[in-house]
């Protein structure tokens, strides 16, 4: 049916108060959950056949950088691949890709960001529940097993890629592919 703005505001306020009331009532259980959350996540990661995810694109290094930057803001460890690899129909180079190992305290967040969810038990969900993070960035990615995993150098601070004009100044025109996130700035 029709949802009015006052109804949605009232609904959000009621939900907020209900959440506060519930958190007070479940204080001990919530504290226990908090204490076990990260140790249990590491245990889950150890049992997961997916040992890492790799993502990146030599055609769009800026978007690759921005995704890496978001992951680092969430205390997710990143590495360069130990060697270039082909997986899931894409080639991931040591210069233009990142590897995200699953064996870290942010395992559950990593899993949620990289999993491909295509079916839902409930027909009501926010649109972001369907976003696979690399696909939302239009970046190729792949799951890696222990056999495929090869970690290179750890990346503390991803570096923003620098573009350049190749071939010198032209008197007539420039020809380039509009692949990168900032390619429109050259137009």
Segments predicted by a language model, with ranges:
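Intrinsic-disorder/low-complexity accessory segments
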Residues: 1-187
